UniProtKB/Swiss-Prot annotation:
Homotrimer; non-covalently linked. Expressed by the liver. It comes from Bothrops moojeni. Disulfide bonds join 83-160, 138-152. It comes from the Eukaryota. Glycans are attached at residue 122. GO terms for cellular component: extracellular region. Residues 46-161 form the C-type lectin domain. GO terms for molecular function: carbohydrate binding; phospholipase A2 inhibitor activity. This phospholipase A2 inhibitor binds directly phospholipase A2 in the presence or absence of calcium. Its main location: secreted. Residues 1-19 form the signal peptide. It is found in: Secreted. This is Phospholipase A2 inhibitor clone 08.
Length: 166
């Protein structure tokens, strides 16, 4: 959409610079102006619709991050590839409300899922006795949102995290 808008503006600039030679009666210029105005309205409408859907999806959880599953069961490496292909991320809750939103997905499906914990995480939700490196080098969340050490070879629910910066 932005590419079309920018292309239209470029054409508009060309016509403004060479207007009389290329478009003596101004019909092409007026058509371009109308087209650019139409694209601007369409872009504003799409942005508004997107923000409405995003706010609705994040309303119940209070989290600006969305946690979505495709209902597949995969190991950590497969999860990484799936989330990357979907232009998402492996879940990495940074706040309690984000962890709750993530846990809501797990609870609905009655399954555990992988997450990643950053080295500088201010928020953690480790279960009692965790982290336990003997259990594995990956981390999984249970249906209550508690974190546990896990083997990266375990097959768990695929959940990807999506967030939007506007």
């Amino acid at each position: 959409m932005r590419l079309i808008l920018l292309s239209s503006l470029l054409l508009l600039g060309i016509f403004l610079a060479n207007g009389d030679e290329v478009d003596p009666d101004g019909k092409v210029l007026n058509s371009l102006i109308y087209g650019v105005m139409h694209l601007q309205r369409e872009f504003a409408n799409l942005k508004g619709a997107f923000l409405t859907v995003h706010r609705a999806r994040s309303f119940g959880s209070g989290s600006e991050r969305l946690y979505v599953t495709n209902k597949e069961i995969k190991n950590f490496e497969a999860l990484r590839q799936i989330c990357e292909q979907a232009e998402g991320h492996i879940p990495s809750p940074q706040l309690e409300n984000q962890n709750k939103a993530f846990a809501n997905v797990l609870e609905r499906h009655g399954k555990e899922a992988y997450l990643v914990v950053g080295d500088s995480a201010n928020f953690t939700n480790w279960a009692a006795g965790e982290p336990n490196k003997a259990a594995g080098t990956c981390v999984k969340a249970d249906t209550h949102g508690s974190w546990h050490s896990a083997s990266c070879d375990d097959n768990l629910l695929v959940v990807c995290e999506f967030y939007f910066i506007l």
